[in-house]
Swiss-Prot record:
One of its GO terms (molecular function) is sulfate transmembrane transporter activity. Belongs to the SLC26A/SulP transporter (TC 2.A.53) family. It is found in: Cell membrane. Induction: Up-regulated by sulfur deprivation. Residues 542-664 form the STAS domain. The chain crosses the membrane at residues 102-122, 124-144, 150-170, 201-221, 223-243, 275-295, 306-326, 347-367, 393-413, 430-450, 458-478, 497-517. Its main location: membrane. One of its GO terms (cellular component) is plasma membrane. InterPro entries: SLC26A/SulP_dom (IPR011547), SLC26A/SulP_fam (IPR001902), STAS_dom (IPR002645), STAS_dom_sf (IPR036513). Keywords: Cell membrane, Membrane, Stress response, Sulfate transport, Symport, Transmembrane, Transmembrane helix, Transport. Residues 704-718 have a biased composition (Low complexity). This is Proton/sulfate cotransporter 2. Disruption phenotype: No effect on sulfate uptake, due to the redundancy with SLT1 and SLTR2. Slt1 and sultr2 double mutants, as well as slt2 and sultr2 show a 50% decline in uptake while the slt1, slt2 and sultr2 triple mutant exhibits no increase in sulfate uptake capacity when deprived of sulfur.
Amino acid sequence: MKRNTSNVDTGGVPAPLNSTPSTRLIQNGYGDSKYETERMEFPFPEDPRYHPRDSVKGAWEKVKEDHHHRVATYNWVDWLAFFIPCVRWLRTYRRSYLLNDIVAGISVGFMVVPQGLSYANLAGLPSVYGLYGAFLPCIVYSLVGSSRQLAVGPVAVTSLLLGTKLKDILPEAAGISNPNIPGSPELDAVQEKYNRLAIQLAFLVACLYTGVGIFRLGFVTNFLSHAVIGGFTSGAAITIGLSQVKYILGISIPRQDRLQDQAKTYVDNMHNMKWQEFIMGTTFLFLLVLFKEVGKRSKRFKWLRPIGPLTVCIIGLCAVYVGNVQNKGIKIIGAIKAGLPAPTVSWWFPMPEISQLFPTAIVVMLVDLLESTSIARALARKNKYELHANQEIVGLGLANFAGAIFNCYTTTGSFSRSAVNNESGAKTGLACFITAWVVGFVLIFLTPVFAHLPYCTLGAIIVSSIVGLLEYEQAIYLWKVNKLDWLVWMASFLGVLFISVEIGLGIAIGLAILIVIYESAFPNTALVGRIPGTTIWRNIKQYPNAQLAPGLLVFRIDAPIYFANIQWIKERLEGFASAHRVWSQEHGVPLEYVILDFSPVTHIDATGLHTLETIVETLAGHGTQVVLANPSQEIIALMRRGGLFDMIGRDYVFITVNEAVTFCSRQMAERGYAVKEDNTSSYPHFGSRRTPGALPAPSSQLDSSPPTSVTESTSGTPAAGTYSSIGGAVPAVAGHTAAGNGGSHSPSAQPGVQLTTTGSQRQQ
């Protein structure tokens, strides 16, 4: 009995990774005891989708097993690390890390203070809310987050989403030009309600984050492709930049979020531009870009990058205190509330606008989650440690919960600040903790100073910060690689620019899902031919030299079969069968066999199975037998339950296309048909949705000579008894014999390869 070392499903649960391989008897796909073979089991990793009927039970058993393991082996420190992840890096903290973490924390603190003030203004909130968002959420994340370099706080895209959507919910807020000083008791009440909506949104986002993390639903971000997010962030970057140009120009205009409206408003109000703010704003913008570029290009001056925003803030404050520019046409922020944030739990409920807030919370959570996890994974990979994805999501949720409790709007990981944190040498979450207390120091002692900061400074900081969000290089790459992905990118980009932020994102996600549905509903199918001189069967569209055999049609389906694509597959198969029938008759041979290559097919649903039965019956009515090649054990089990396996017949299921063709050609030869391969030049064209370019054959021996005798075998040795080959003699076959029992392939054989096999090589 030959030992089979292939991975054949036993229907059981995979062995633990630390288990040793074991040997046992299994049955092949036919269920025949005479084909019972011995195999070596291998401990493969568990896949909860492998047995869907047992997945829920298996997951629950895994939870119980993990719990029992922890109870049996964990000490109090392990339990503390389980609930507070910062204990993991505290247990291995080195003294050499301390200086790096302090430098990184202070550097990011210098960066986040002016950015926080700017982003809060972009969100339509008082400037101090940006500092609140960089304080307590940062502390909480440093304790419960799993990334050691991620810098948490307010970000530009989220601020834009809030400023856009909340003003749709509360239109009265559009009339407030300075959230720090609304200007009247009525506007004060409107601003307070606006602030309350922002806190309620943060609470909903925190709930979504925590739920996604606890129930391990992080896969939902897979529906936001890189094309969707790239186009979204690029469009949002332009929208953000244009919304801040008014501060650099010194123009007082209402906020507009659509490109055409912004352009019209600027053109109509350009005569109101103040040259003082324009000169100061453009000077600050030049300095910020200069500091950033020099810091990125030179390791010697990398310290310039994080201090750029703080530097222009200091220059602006000096101009106010020394030059008294606020009385010369320069607008300043105004009053900023001093001290640490006060609790706002009472603002959570009642929530009458929940029907409008909840969809926005979903969008904000998805965008923030993708942005944060992508940079966290990149940093973990770069610093060679493991990122716990679900713990990361829970950590962000708890950070937002803390923010919602203490007057903060939604926060997430920042690309720019996280990059600076990593470049500054941050080793652990202590750097994030130090950043929070830099912000806390500003809140307690320096808010009166920042109240005199010119608005053009904040505008310049935001414009310089969003330059990195413009992913035009990604659009060029997608155009070269995949036009459909480029279309999704452009839909997201143009939708955000010309319609609105949330609608543009929705259009892009919808288009991406439609493309996935289209690709799934119209999968690639192929007419397969043999490469001359080999036992390799390939798509004749890609390999024009591949040869076909009259009377034998080999059809490959490159996708799972289910209700959405089975009609397309049926039409393609019927078209190929009709064309092949005519072509075979021209060679004096009827279409005897249709061989379905199921190697790419991983799943068949009930509709697909029923339609396959119809196809088998239809072909049988034309005198054509359906043959299966290389179906998986799961597909065979499904066909058994549905009755399709018995309808086809166990004698017509093979482990390879080559074996199926050899068997069918032998049967046809026994019936008196001379089966000889021919090239595809005379084959009738049958169009395909995809027509890839021709590829070179995978063999240097590309001739059309009659094949010579050699057996296809995993060991490279021919079998003692063989089926007849295409175009060759038909030796007598007494029965099925085991593979690999003698002979060897001679390199001096005639050109070409005879397709021979043994019965024992059928589907096991």
